[in-house]
Regions:
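Bacterial N-terminal signal peptides
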Residues: 4-17
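N-terminal "domain-start" segment that seeds a small globular fold
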Residues: 23-56
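Short loop/turn microsegments at loop-to-beta-strand junctions
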Residues: 39-40, 62, 167-169
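Short active-site neighborhood of thiol/selenol oxidoreductases, capturing the structured segment around
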Residues: 55-81
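Solvent-exposed coil/turn segments that connect beta secondary-structure elements
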Residues: 59, 70, 102-103, 126-127, ...
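Structural microenvironment flanking redox-active thiols in thiol-disulfide oxidoreductases
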Residues: 78-134
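Thiol/selenol-based redox catalytic cores and closely related redox-interacting motifs
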Residues: 124-189
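A short, polar/charged loop-to-alpha-helix boundary motif
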Residues: 188-203
Length: 207
C-alpha cells in the first residue's frame, strides 16, 4: 500500500515537472491557443478566496478572458482603465468578462493604482489557467532581479515560487467553448485596446 502511494506521488511529481518544463522561459516563444481551438477548463479565485470554475465544452454565456500580469504592472493598470470604456457594453451584450492575473486573491484590488474598478478579477496565482491557455512563461533570474530593483517581488505577489507570468492576452470564446478571437503579445507594453476588443467581440454578440 505504501509502495503504491509512493509511486502515485512520484508520477504526480513528474507530471508537474513536465508541465513546468513545457512553459517557455522566453515570452517570445509563447504559443497561445488559436482561433478555432477548444477553450480549456479553468478556474480562478476571487478576492474572498472563492473559486470560480469555467468548465470546458460549454459556457453559460460567451466569455472574454483577459490575462494581465498584475496590479503592480503600470501597463496593466492602463489597460484595465482603458477597458472600462467597453466592459459594460460587453456585459450588456451578454458576455461574461473575466480578468485573470498572478496576484494573490487578497491583492487583486488593493494592488491596483486605479481604485474605481469593479471588474470580475480572479487570481491565477499558480498560473494554471495561463498554462492551460498556453500564455504562461517563466521568469529568468535576471528578470526577477530587475523586477526586485523596482520593488516588485514576484514570489510575494503570487505567493508561490513558480516565477511565472502570463503574456498579456485576450480570448473571446463562444458559448460552445470555441475560441473565436485571440490577442497575445510578448511585448507587455502593447495591449489590446477597448475599440479593438469591441470590434472583435461585437460580431459574436450579434449571432
Amino acid at each position: 500500500m505504501r509502495l503504491s502511494s509512493l509511486w502515485f506521488g512520484l508520477v504526480f511529481s513528474l507530471s508537474g515537472a513536465v508541465a513546468i518544463a513545457d512553459v517557455p522561459a522566453d515570452p517570445a516563444k509563447v504559443q497561445a491557443l488559436k482561433v478555432g481551438d477548444a477553450a480549456p477548463a479553468f478556474s480562478g479565485l476571487s478576492v474572498d478566496g472563492v473559486e470560480r470554475t469555467f468548465p470546458a465544452g460549454a459556457y453559460a454565456k460567451p466569455t472574454v478572458v483577459i490575462f494581465y500580469r498584475g496590479g503592480w504592472c503600470p501597463y496593466c493598470n492602463l489597460q484595465l482603465a482603458d477597458l472600462r470604456l467597453v466592459e459594460p457594453r460587453l456585459r450588456a451584450s451578454g458576455f461574461e468578462v473575466v480578468f485573470l492575473s498572478t496576484d494573490r486573491p487578497e491583492l487583486l484590488y488593493s494592488s491596483l493604482k486605479e481604485k474605481d474598478i469593479h471588474y470580475t478579477l480572479l487570481s491565477d496565482h499558480h498560473s494554471a489557467a495561463a498554462e492551460a491557455f498556453r500564455v504562461a512563461y517563466r521568469l529568468d533570474d535576471a528578470t526577477l532581479a530587475e523586477l526586485r530593483e523596482y520593488g516588485i517581488d514576484v514570489e510575494a505577489t503570487t505567493g508561490t515560487k513558480r516565477h511565472e507570468l502570463p503574456v498579456p492576452s485576450v480570448f473571446v470564446i463562444d458559448k460552445a467553448g470555441v475560441i473565436r478571437f485571440v490577442y497575445s503579445n510578448p511585448d507587455y507594453t502593447v495591449r489590446l485596446g477597448a475599440d479593438a476588443l469591441w470590434s472583435a467581440a461585437s460580431g459574436l454578440a450579434a449571432r
